[in-house]
From Swiss-Prot:
One of its GO terms (molecular function) is magnesium ion binding. GO terms for cellular component: cytosol. It catalyses: RNA(n+1) + phosphate = RNA(n) + a ribonucleoside 5'-diphosphate. Its EC number is 2.7.7.8. This is Polyribonucleotide nucleotidyltransferase. The lineage of its organism: Bacteria, Bacillati, Bacillota, Bacilli, Lactobacillales. Belongs to the polyribonucleotide nucleotidyltransferase family. Signal peptide: none annotated. Residues 625-693 form the S1 motif domain. Gene3D superfamilies: GHMP Kinase, N-terminal domain (3.30.230.70), K Homology domain, type 1 (3.30.1370.10), Nucleic acid-binding proteins (2.40.50.140). Residues 691-710 are annotated as: Disordered.
Length: 710
């Protein structure tokens, strides 16, 4: 295929698609140019079905530093593992694409997005999502798209599609919404306590904008799209399925309705193992035993899936016996740990998260050096999910994509209520340790984070709580579930996480397993989530009503002083010599910003006070008219040099020592003597003249005697 170019304008920026010039051996490839951002997307598919019980889709988002005209950091000067932003963007693209493949599709698919040039005012992630859908759509890979995504901002009551950098900084909303022509199928958002009505309108505005991008893709597919390949889907033997269902469905139904998680898992597993043992023995001599046993496992999974969904939609019975809109039992605890700067333990049913707060000087902020201009990140929220939380063994190591994603969601939810840097000049880190999990652990980490922040004395604007909503739909009828547990998440159609305060929403995240959901479902889910959020906030506020007025004794204390910008170099000294000396003497940590704000951190208030005294002395300037208690440091014929304070000296001219004539300075003063002086002049070079006699009343002039004349 020769190169073909397709052009349109979207959200005020040129959108150009090139097909047929590069990566021609991939099943499908596109170059998408949005503004000055350029993304190459290549989609490939394996020729055979993969083993395993899941669809092996891999989406990568690769940031090449040359795209922004930068050298990679580090010793190797080469791109390494994906950044957190790259990982989150890959997840953002994966989530709306995954539901668009057929049930039973098991061929491995890889979608690789490479950022070739970067424009901070034209979203490369949005371009990559567009390119991913288009590369799959024009390929022979059986993808049931297209999909597209946009960013939505909210400024002065107006919604903005794909806002630029300046607009996004001013926006009360940072929303990414994706979907098909028919419905929304992915949401990711942070918001500054916006109402459910505004959030719903933003979602609908985003979906409306998506239609334009989908229509553009359809035009391109009509010209260059390939015929879709015929691939084998995972299908079970119908006779085998009928046999197993007839014999064992009643037993599995009974096991599924055991309310307690571990007991239910044991009961269902016992039924499954019994069935597998019977059919393994029956077909032991069959050459297709492996395929038969794979089908048996798949049939049992489908039976459990169908029963859980039937109970909810028809009987309105949940696996643990709760009502459709009922939250599991809640518990909130603060000060779970000694010594740390703050801690909170939040439990919702069999899901439990411990959040631990650490405060540090601003020098500990994380420096983010990616494609965007380098910046410092003050607030970090890390999420850990050990395997023991679900009673299993497993891999331990660096955080995976899921842990990074859940940590970022909690970070967005909580950062909206943090105090400003001026109010609270600390770097803040929260670590969420999931101790038990039966669904919604990311939302438990948000609730635990709120407890830890308030217990640690961080003056947040309001408590934040999170809840996960679910959906069971047969295409005609649906049921929205409040506070989904693991089984409902696994067999359900939606995981819709909503976090916020009593005033409004601070974060949203939605993943679905069906092609999309309607505005009616979204509205109902948001309304149920608000009710549940308020119930959780009641429990949090009953435990700790507001942030404590004082930090923990172990937290670093802080004091801030302001110095003139031109005095920064005086405090730092040559090569950092002066500031290092201060730190060595007092044991504090010192941060100085470009505006002359000096922050001093220590657990010892006396050390802070001493540091302030030293710095004040370094930056202090003599002022005309002020009086100083000085020390004579050198005597010359023409006067005496005195030290006013620290490194500031002044000259007391011989004529300024006394009102009467001074013949010799050394007759009046000696080195080391303390004297009071008044500054009378500072010249343009900063040289200071002082006077002793200015502090002494001037003696009256002697009266002239009248001469007598005879």
């Amino acid at each position: 295929m020769s190169k073909q170019t397709f052009t349109t304008t979207f959200a005020g920026k040129p959108l150009v698609v090139e097909v047929g010039q590069v990566a021609k051996q991939a099943n499908g490839a596109t170059v998408v140019r949005y503004g000055d951002s350029t993304v190459l997307t290549a989609a490939v598919m394996s020729k055979k079905m993969a083993t395993g019980d899941f669809f092996p889709l891999q989406v990568n988002y690769e940031e090449k530093m040359y795209a922004a005209g930068k050298f990679p950091g580090g010793f190797m000067k080469r791109e390494g593992r994906p950044s957190t932003d790259a990982t989150l963007t890959a997840r953002l693209i994966d989530r709306p694409i995954r539901p668009m493949f057929a049930e039973g599709f098991r061929n491995e698919v890889q979608v690789i997005n490479t950022v070739l040039s970067y424009d901070e005012n034209a979203s490369a992630p949005v371009a990559a999502m567009f390119g991913s859908s288009l590369a799959l759509s024009i390929s022979d890979i059986p993808f049931n798209g297209p999909i597209a995504g946009v960013q939505v901002g909210y400024i002065d009551g107006e919604f903005i599609i794909n806002p630029d950098k300046e607009q996004m900084e001013a926006s009360l909303l940072e929303l990414t919404v994706a979907g098909s022509k028919e419905a929304i199928n992915m949401v990711e958002s942070g918001a500054k306590e916006l109402s459910e009505d505004i959030m719903l309108e933003a979602l609908l505005k985003g979906h409306q904008a998506i239609q334009e991008l989908i229509a553009f893709q359809e035009q391109i597919v009509a010209v260059v799209g390939k015929e879709k390949a015929e691939v084998e889907l995972l299908q079970v033997d119908a006779d085998l399925q009928a046999d197993i269902v007839a014999k064992y469905n009643a037993q599995l139904q009974k096991a599924v309705q055991v309310e307690e998680k571990k007991a239910r898992e044991a009961a269902t597993e016992a039924v499954k193992e019994m069935v597998k043992a019977e059919y393994e023995e029956r077909y032991a001599e069959d050459e297709n035993l492996a395929t038969i046993m794979r089908d048996v496992a798949e049939i049992l999974e489908q039976m459990e899936h169908a029963e859980v969904r039937r109970l909810i939609t028809e009987d309105k019975i949940r696996p643990d016996g709760r009502k459709i809109d009922e939250i599991r039992p809640l518990d909130a605890v603060v000060d779970f740990l000694p010594k740390v700067h703050g801690s909170g333990l939040f439990t919702r049913g069999q899901t439990q998260a411990l959040s631990v707060l650490t405060l540090a000087p601003m020098g500990e902020t994380q420096i983010i050096d990616g494609l965007a201009p380098e910046y410092k990140k003050r607030f970090l929220h890390h999420y850990n999910f050990p395997q023991y939380s679900v009673g299993e063994t497993g891999r331990y190591g660096a955080a995976g994509r899921r842990e990074i994603g859940h940590g970022a969601l909690g970070e967005r939810a909580l950062e909206q209520v943090l105090p400003s840097l001026e109010e609270f000049p600390y770097a803040i880190r929260l670590v969420a340790e999931v101790l038990e999990s039966n669904g919604s652990s990311s939302q438990a980490s948000i609730c635990a984070g709120t407890l830890a922040l308030m217990a640690g004395g961080v003056p947040i604007k309001a408590p934040v709580a999170g809840i996960a909503m679910g959906l069971i739909s047969d295409g005609t009828n649906y049921t929205v579930l409040t506070d989904i547990q693991g089984l409902e998440d696994h067999f359900g159609d939606m995981d819709f996480k909503v976090a916020g305060t009593r005033e409004g929403i601070t974060a949203l995240q939605m993943d679905i397993k069906i092609a999309g959901i309607t505005p009616q479902i979204l509205e109902e889910a948001l309304a149920q989530a608000k009710k549940a959020r308020f119930e959780i906030l009641d429990v949090i506020e009953a435990t700790i009503a507001e942030p404590r007025p004082e930090l923990a004794p172990t937290a670093p204390k802080i004091d801030t002083i302001k110095i003139d910008v031109d005095k920064i170099k005086v405090v730092i000294g040559k090569g950092g010599e002066t500031i290092d000396k201060i730190i060595a003497e007092t044991g504090v940590k010192i941060d100085i910003d470009d505006e002359g704000n000096v922050s001093i951190y220590s657990s010892d208030q006396a050390a802070i006070d001493r540091t302030k005294e030293i710095i004040a002395g370094l930056v202090r300037e003599a002022k005309v008219g002020e009086v100083y208690h000085a020390k004579v440091i050198r005597i010359e014929k023409f006067g005496a040099f005195v030290n006013l304070f620290d490194k500031t000296d002044a000259l007391v001219h011989i004529s300024e020592i006394a009102w009467t004539r001074t013949a010799n300075v050394s007759d009046v003063l000696e080195v080391g003597e303390d004297v009071d002086v008044k500054v009378i002049k500072i010249d343009e070079k900063g040289r200071v003249d002082a006077s002793m006699k200015a502090l002494i009343p001037r003696p009256p002039k002697p009266e002239k005697k009248e001469e007598k004349h005879d």
